[in-house]
Amino acid sequence: MRFRSLPERTAALRTTWWCAVLALGVALCASGCSTVQTPSPKDPYEGFNRSVYKFNDTVDTAVLKPVATGYKTVVPSPVRTCVSNVFSNVGELWSALNSALQGKGEECANTLMRFALNSTFGFAGCLDIASEIPGLQQRNEDLGQTLGKWGMAPGPYLVLPFFGPSTVRDAAGFSVELVTDPVTNADNVRARNSATALRFVSRRAELLDASRILEGAALDPYSFLRDAYLQRRLNQVYDGEPPDEPPPPNYDDQAPADTPATK
């Protein structure tokens, strides 16, 4: 299989983002740019984001969710697991690179070992035999996490058309991933489109139970999903040990001793 050259990838990325912008325009025209009286500091574009969220939810309800439900109903569980594992195995090299960029040498080596074992003895990743070996459990690292590790702030929360929750930092990392992703950059158009569609459906099928819980438990699914996403990304950047938030300032403290008393 031949992969597209960098200029071709850049052009494809440009096309993808133009499609996203067009979808965003449709979302805004359909639902209007709702305004929020007091937006959260972490979500200053909440009105904008809610419009995109509504658009994504409409697309998901009309297309993705029914297709994913049918996929889960028709395709046997071992086959679905194989498909999911293959796509996960493809991402191991990108994860290993980001581990290296974060200075996690041992984790990078373990991820490369996972890729080698699953690609050979696991039939191109269909079987995740590496997870049965102590120390070779999967660890997902991406460029958004790497940028966070380097000290880049996440920036405002964003909802991307079709792709969902993100931040300015994560969106920047995701753009680079699109350019380097071997699935979306395969030269054979039919194979590329089929693999991309299958990956979307496979991932959506994995989230069916979670989406049902979200719909049933959250009074405001948008806020619930936003807060869960931001907390999850914070934990991922700091490997499960995020720094404690500074306590709010106490304005009731007494004045310093050297402050002259008021007469």
Where would I find each of the regions flagged by the language model?
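Bacterial N-terminal signal peptides that target proteins for export
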Residues: 2-21
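A structured, mid-to-C-terminal "fold-capping" secondary-structure block
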Residues: 37, 145, 149-263
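Bacterial Sec-type N-terminal signal peptides, specifically the leucine/valine-rich hydrophobic h-region
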Residues: 29-30
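Membrane interface segments of multi-pass transport proteins and intramembrane proteases
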Residues: 62, 67-78, 133-135, 144
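Beta-rich strand-turn-strand
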Residues: 84-86
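Post-signal peptide N-terminal segment of mature Sec-exported envelope proteins
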Residues: 40-71, 88
